[in-house]
A protein has these predicted regions:
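Secondary-structure boundary/capping micro-motif
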Residues: 1-296
Length: 296
């Protein structure tokens, strides 16, 4: 008998802006499923959310493993299949989460493609935590700014023959779930956006290696595109940065940077990355919707 595998889980295990009676910050575990996106850009399927508070004195991989076991059991009681993968976006918690996942049949995927979790966390920061006793109102000390690594060139075998800027109206992206593609990862479209708003992206072309390139990129967990100076950079995983193109003309780089900045404001940060055999080929070997969110 084949055991079904459920959607990936997204996990955050971290302190919250709430002081407990002992003067220590409250820790909390949040888990939710990565939503499946239908042909209209809407999330669907069995959704699972689970939360537990954790005393600061109990923050360790043992507590986390026991909590994960509870979450798996509760998901099973709801008729939901267990996931195979856990996505975790906090680099500082990676080792602890990995230790907790060992022995539970869960694979840790260091990734910032945790859009559902980030949205839930933002909602809790606005609506839930301020109502809790001990909530620390006002500005908190900001976390240390992440150290951005120098972009690394793509391996020779993963480079396309050419690439091009692209743009699609938001309404077209709602149909991405029905497009023919070998590798694909979509994200829910934020509500309330103008259907005609342009969403910027990049198309990579290779007549002989499009499928291989798409497969390689799929393992990177692509997050967002960035124009840094005269370089086009793909951010992926937790902190990886891959150089897609360099030595862009100054005017071209400036215009592209403005377009991507406008997308963050107008299109909820949405972007896309596509891999095709050629510009005239309708099929996508790879298609990823990305979303540029502020760094946590």
């Amino acid at each position: 008998m084949t055991t079904s595998i459920g959607p990936d889980w997204e996990l955050d295990y971290y302190s919250r802006p709430i002081l407990e009676p002992d003067g220590k910050k409250r820790w909390e575990l949040l888990i939710c499923t990565t939503p499946e996106v239908d042909s209209q850009g809407e999330s669907h399927g069995g959704s699972f959310r689970w939360s537990r508070t954790c005393p600061a004195s109990s923050v360790n991989s043992i507590w986390l493993r026991e909590a994960l076991q509870e979450a798996l059991a509760e998901a099973g009681q709801q008729g939901l299949a267990a996931p195979r993968r856990l996505r975790c976006w906090r680099a500082s918690m990676r080792t602890m989460v990995q230790r907790a996942a060992e022995g539970l049949g869960l694979e840790l995927v260091p990734s910032r493609r945790t859009y559902a979790l980030v949205s839930w966390l933002q909602q809790r920061e606005q609506e839930v935590y301020p109502e809790q006793e001990g909530y620390m109102a006002g500005p908190l000390a900001p976390p240390p700014a992440p150290i951005r690594s120098v972009p690394v060139p793509l391996p020779e075998a993963a480079r396309g023959d050419q690439w091009a800027w692209a743009s699609l109206p938001l309404d077209a992206l709602r149909e991405a779930g029905g497009w023919e593609s070998s590798f694909r990862s979509l994200v829910p479209i934020p509500p309330g956006l103008d259907p005609a708003v342009p969403v910027p992206g990049i198309r990579l072309f290779s007549r002989s290696r499009a499928l291989a390139i798409a497969g390689w990129l799929a393992g990177l967990e692509p997050v967002r595109l960035e124009i840094s100076g005269n370089q086009l950079v793909l951010e992926a995983g937790l902190e990886d940065r891959w150089l897609l193109a360099s030595a862009l003309p100054e005017a071209e780089a400036s215009a592209a940077a403005e377009a991507f900045a406008a997308a963050r404001e107008q299109a909820g940060g949405l972007q896309f990355l596509a891999v095709q055999a050629s510009e005239s080929e309708p099929r996508f070997e790879g298609f990823w919707m990305l979303r540029d969110l502020p760094d946590a």
